[in-house]
Amino acid sequence: MPTREISLILLSTLQCNAACEYCFEHRAPDRLTIDRLEVLIGKVLDYLQSQSIGSLTIYWQGGEAMLVSPDWYDHAYDLISEAAAKRGVAIRHCLQSNLLAYTKEWNPLIARMFGNSIGTSVDYPNLHRKLPGRSPAHYDKMWLRKLREAQ
């Protein structure tokens, strides 16, 4: 019998560094605290264990997920890994980002937590994604530069 799996989307922050015209987020300064994450993950993992569900994929999104520091994600990774191991649940993490906050300081975390993979997206033609006070063309140039840096 195949292992049953659940997917969970977690928003580490609602903040964003872009000004996309179609965005529905309120850009509140709220961030997911480690204490809140610990409670949430405990409840999710307890439920999975009670239902004999052995695998959880966590999709980290936002706002913009990379506006939370790599250190925060390191702490979150350790907390989640330990809690999941105690309950026999396999965990996989995925990161969705606009890449605008990417720097090489993210590389160790991306390797450790996200399997050297980041999800991103592009609009073509880009009519609505932009940085505050800038054009969509400026956003595209910045995104392409960050994409090359992340390779």
What is each residue range found by the language model?
Residues 42-46, 50-59, 68-151:
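Radical SAM/AdoMet-radical enzyme domain recognition
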Residues 63-64:
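Active-site neighborhood of divalent metal-dependent phosphoester/pyrophosphate hydrolases
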Residues 2-36:
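Canonical Radical SAM [4Fe-4S] cluster-binding loop centered on the CxxxCxxC motif
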Residues 39:
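N-terminal binding-site loop/beta-alpha segment at the start of enzyme catalytic domains
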